[in-house]
Design a protein with these regions (language model features):
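Solvent-exposed edge beta-strands and adjacent loop segments
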Residues: 2-90, 136-151
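Viral virion structural and adsorption modules
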Residues: 1-5, 158, 162-185
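Extracellular/virion structural assembly segments
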Residues: 70-134, 164-174, 184
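Acidic-enriched, low-complexity/disordered segments with a strong bias for Aspartate over Glutamate
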Residues: 27-30, 38, 53, 68, ...
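Short beta-strand and beta-hairpin "edge-sheet" elements
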Residues: 56, 121-165
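Short, low-complexity, polar/charged sequence segments that are solvent-exposed and flexible
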Residues: 106-112, 139-143, 154-158, 175-179
Length: 185
């Protein structure tokens, strides 16, 4: 399912659509993680493929790198030298799901280098705000599970470089039905 199809379904089924003025809580289900699986036909983020069908988790984490240095009369000081965005994705196998068919393909499972780097977006369906960048897809398990259980998969997604801010409403102005002015944090 594409980003635009997912948002249309959320609007129809649950009355949820991105609004810059949204304030309130967000649940895990309020975030979309999507990747570009075909650069020739998916030229806009709205056409990218959403990671959702039979997915139990797409947890985002920020992994900071640091350097400790000792200074005279100051002692040890920790400096932050960078941050890498990572996602942990796992769920039940579902043949025919566009995301899983791509992510669990032979090309991705056994690929190396730039063959396994894809553009991604990660944003809130409540506000439309998030990030975009490129990431490495690393499949850790393509078929897991015990006897009589659903087959499972697990993968890590690690950003390449620093992602940039992303706003779905700015990238897709026709989706912006919010007439209220955004509230600054």
């Amino acid at each position: 399912m594409t980003v635009s199809e997912t948002l249309a379904a959320l609007k129809t089924q649950k009355g949820i659509e991105p609004k810059a003025s949204y304030t309130g809580t967000e649940d895990t289900d309020d975030f979309i993680f999507a990747v570009q699986t075909d650069s020739s036909s998916q030229t806009k983020e709205s056409a990218w493929i959403v990671c959702a069908d039979h997915v139990k988790e797409h947890s985002g984490a920020l992994n900071a790198t640091t350097a400790d240095e000792a200074f005279i009369r100051t002692g040890t000081v920790t400096s932050k030298t960078g941050t890498q965005r990572t996602f942990s994705i796992n769920g039940n196998r579902c043949v025919g799901d566009d995301f899983q068919d791509f992510a669990l393909s032979h090309k991705i499972k056994y690929g190396t280098g730039s063959d396994v780097i894809v553009p991604y977006i990660y944003f809130s369906i409540r506000t439309g705000k998030g990030e975009s960048g490129s990431a490495v897809l690393i499949v850790n398990s393509d078929v897991g599970g015990a006897a009589n259980a659903s087959a499972t998969f697990a993968m890590d997604v690690k950003a390449v470089g620093t992602p940039v801010e992303f706003d779905y409403l700015e990238a897709n102005p026709q989706s912006n039905t919010d007439t209220a002015k955004p509230v600054k944090a």
